[in-house]
Amino acid sequence: MRKRKTVIFIRKKRPEANSIEEIFNSLIKYLGDDVELLELPCSGASISAIVKNIHFARKHRGDINHITGEVHYIALGTGCRTLITIHDVQSIIRGGRIAKTIKKWLWFNLPLLIARKVSVISHLQKTNLSCCVLLRKRKSLL
């Protein structure tokens, strides 16, 4: 029987903010041969970067996918066999009314509709997320 391939997607490293990436880079050696850690090719939130990252995620998706960091939108490429871990809500939803609306849909509503599981790192983030996005009634936050 073939082992299931798990892919953990992390955002592209940024010098000013990379603690999550450092943690996963340290842990990957303990997770087994069937787990692969992939850094996305583009940073930032430009349309071009988002499209390239979604395409990359689709091309490299595994049997099980874990999205961590602030790139939840790549669930549009990984599909439903995805776990999204949300570390922070408020830092993503910034800007004017139009920007906030787009980010809520692209970073939260659409990915959370697609992903099979969603985890948050704290009760505060669970509350923040529940207040700002639409969640399916049967979708539980871990």
Regions found by a protein language model. Give the residues of each.
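Active-site donor-binding segments of glycosyltransferases and PAPS-dependent sulfotransferases
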Residues: 3-74
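Residues at the starts of beta-strands that form the adenosine-phosphate
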Residues: 5-6, 34-36, 81, 116-117, ...
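Structural beta-sheet core signal
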Residues: 7-9, 84, 120, 142
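Short catalytic/ligand-binding loop motif for oxyanion handling, primarily in non-cytosolic enzymes
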Residues: 15-18, 73-76, 91-94, 127-129
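Active-site proximal beta-strand in glycosyltransferases
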Residues: 64-66, 76-95
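Short, conserved loop/helix-junction motifs that constitute active-site signature segments
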Residues: 75-79, 111-114, 134-135
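Membrane-proximal helix-turn-helix segments that form the acceptor-binding/catalytic region
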Residues: 99-118
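A short, active-site helix/loop in glycosyltransferases that binds the activated sugar's phosphate group
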Residues: 115-139
